[in-house]
Amino acid sequence: MTAFVIGLGIALQLQTAVPAAQSATERLASRIQRIEDTQEIERLLLNYGRHLDARDFKAYSLLFAKDGVWSGGMGTVQGPAAIQAFMEKAIPGPNAVHNYHVLSNFVIDVNGDTATAWSRWQFVVPGPNNTAVVAQSGRYDDTLIREDGRWKFKRRVASNDIPSSGPPPVQLQK
């Protein structure tokens, strides 16, 4: 009888340990997924600058969701085809003067198949004696969505901080 009670106790302990192990496995899988999502979103943010600087507006536009919106100092457009046409008209190409964007300070929050991101940008141009000069700097405020298994911009708002194109960031307002 004692062996039966001990065996029953061990069986009950194992039975309760299995859900805990599954829960830990599920938590680990969730954490790994969040890390992978964050890395894919960082790559999306960097590819935005890369395609913009290369004047590859087709690849650039494909970073946006089917109903994705780009909004900035030049206007607001919706949908990849409209974004591509807008950029081809607004930004001359090819990039013969070797200007480029530097992107930094990524803050990314993932929530399932949606995410938000905030980042900084600087636009660098050739200066006197062929030195690099920061001509503009600003921030991006992004809403992202997983579409067809890939992260895309649902909405990207580009704001200039220097020179200013509007009110200062909320953090600097009193």
Q: Where in this protein do the model-derived segments appear?
A:
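Bacterial N-terminal signal peptides
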Residues: T2-Q15
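Short, low-complexity N-terminal intrinsically disordered segments enriched in polar/charged residues
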Residues: A17-R50, A54, L62
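Short beta-strand segments enriched in hydrophobic/aromatic residues
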Residues: L52, F64, W121-F123, V157-N160
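A solvent-exposed, acidic/Ser-Thr-rich amphipathic alpha-helical stretch
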Residues: F57-Q122
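Short, cysteine-centered beta-strand-loop-beta hairpins and adjacent loop/turn segments enriched
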Residues: N95, V124-V134, P163-S164
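Short, surface-exposed coil-to-beta transition loops
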Residues: H101-L103, A135-Y140
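Short beta-strand edge/turn micro-motifs at domain boundaries
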Residues: T116-W118, S137-P167
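Extended, polar beta-sheet/loop recognition surfaces of beta-rich domains
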Residues: G166-K174
